[in-house]
Amino acid sequence: MTIGIYGGSFNPIHQGHLALGRWLVRHTLVDELWFMVSPQNPLKPAAGLLDDNARLRLARLAVGRSQRLRVSDFEFSLPRPSFMADTLAALRQAHPEHDFVLVIGADNWHDFPRWHRPDDILAHHRLIIYPRPGYDIDNTTLPHGVTLAATPLLDISSTQIRRAIASDRAYAGQGLHPRVWKEIQACGYYTLTD
């Protein structure tokens, strides 16, 4: 089975993440997509990052009972910081029956040379890149095994959502799955006092 690994902080997971996952499985680029909740992205600051289990719960609420979208806490048991090269190697060892494909945004592709062991990732895995606002990718320059998917360009980010929640009492959960928004409200996540 071909499994797309979509790693991220998902702080919080939003409709753009879900739309991308649904698009990838609908267009048969992957059989399943696993949202790999990362304890800490080594290239991002930890400030404002919700607890691992809170982000995992929000992701599970968003995905619900989907048969082809899954949420994984696989990285929670790995040494920190979480490097995708290590995660993918551990996944290959734990699940040799699957073909793991890394799913990243165009913004991450621009930073990919700074990743831990990027050549190892490219040697063992195909990559699917999805468009992000402000990051152009020349499809003709991509290495073998790297595909630019023609996914819809969604201008939504977790950072925008966190800022909106913290600054606007009238924010109504735009861009969030209703179950996620309800949990964020109930727990008081992303408020100025959080």
Predicted regions and their residues:
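Nucleotidyltransferase catalytic core that binds NTPs
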Residues: 1-194
